[in-house]
């Protein structure tokens, strides 16, 4: 007969009791009622927060945007093709965040910060919330350092400062992306981290931008965040916030950053699509009522930080596309009112061969000459005035055939000044080259040349001054001022090159 050993049994029971885990895990769950068009309606999830991430049974992540009395409206961060009606959903207790690190430089990622360039995983030890609050008034200081774009028309007349938000606005095919990418190219050696956010564009266009940045060595200091036209609306809506979070990471580490949103019209359309599918009431142009807040909370994150926070900066260049030049549509007026100025690109100027096609008349920088070095202020004031007078005279001269000599001279000068503002794509100029170019035009040295000769002469002049009068560039670079000494070097160089050029042309 088997003997029952009571001590052994009691030991086993004691062990079992000691191993018993009293912890109770409470999971906030719900059931899928309906799914489709990137939207899911969930029953349950009673304690979910607005903006909280939820996870579906098959792994798709969504964001709870609409909290209604009997269901929760969730936007999906994927295609959601495997989600079934009746399947369970659980709240994660987190809000959207992304990993951030220096390793992202030179990479192409999507809105969830996953690499899409086929070059392996990106290591990151820190993370940042995709939507974080903008710096407050005390955390900022006024914009005072220039951010050079390398484009004469912008740096002289519509200057951009570090920490500013300058809108680039125009019809399709007017060179908006070209202005933005040229600005990235010009940051080489300036210790500025660039983030280019492509929203709802063709994959081929994004590939073209990435290739041109790689060819010129600009990807070393650039991160590209891309959500193409075939991406879910949720990801197109999130992409700009992801870019801003990456730029903020560098800004708070006392670095200067430049972020380009290309373009916010497509983000607004993606948000409109999500809102209408969630049955939020439509407003003007069928956009939801909070579309202004969509852009304002994004653009307010651009700032020039105070000296206590390390003087880092985040400069934003949002791009907005207009329909046949209508700047008074809903999204353009919203973004104009949020930003510190706008660069307006005109299709008429573009077609007339004036490129970059910047309409100087209605473009403006609300930071103004605070974002220019002294030498640029000295030469740019005269340029603005002469171009404004030229625009007025040109309109007037169309009605009058017999003009006096002074008016004819002024028109001729204006045409040459307009010519010197033309620039090829991907050929940014240093600030010293811009100063010498503007000085040559405003002081009448180009008046004796034919309009067709102006650009050829200016290219040769820049090369000549670089090799024969390097002192000019050294003085400007060190003092940031057009001193009498620098001016004399510049005058000598222009006179010598002008004589050589005219001789060459005669021959």
From Swiss-Prot:
ATP binds at residues 170-177. Keywords: ATP synthesis, ATP-binding, CF(1), Chloroplast, Hydrogen ion transport, Ion transport, Membrane, Nucleotide-binding, Phosphoprotein, Plastid, Thylakoid, Translocase, Transport. F-type ATPases have 2 components, CF(1) - the catalytic core - and CF(0) - the membrane proton channel. CF(1) has five subunits: alpha(3), beta(3), gamma(1), delta(1), epsilon(1). CF(0) has four main subunits: a, b, b' and c. Coiled coil: none annotated. One of its GO terms (cellular component) is chloroplast thylakoid membrane. The record marks 363 as: Required for activity. It is found in: Plastid, Chloroplast thylakoid membrane. The keyword Thylakoid applies. It comes from Arabidopsis thaliana (Mouse-ear cress). PROSITE patterns: ATPASE_ALPHA_BETA. It is a peripheral membrane protein. GO terms for biological process: response to cold. It comes from the Eukaryota. It catalyses: ATP + H2O + 4 H(+)(in) = ADP + phosphate + 5 H(+)(out). Belongs to the ATPase alpha/beta chains family. Its EC number is 7.1.2.2. This is ATP synthase subunit alpha, chloroplastic. The modification Phosphothreonine is found at residue 257. Produces ATP from ADP in the presence of a proton gradient across the membrane. The alpha chain is a regulatory subunit. One of its GO terms (molecular function) is zinc ion binding.
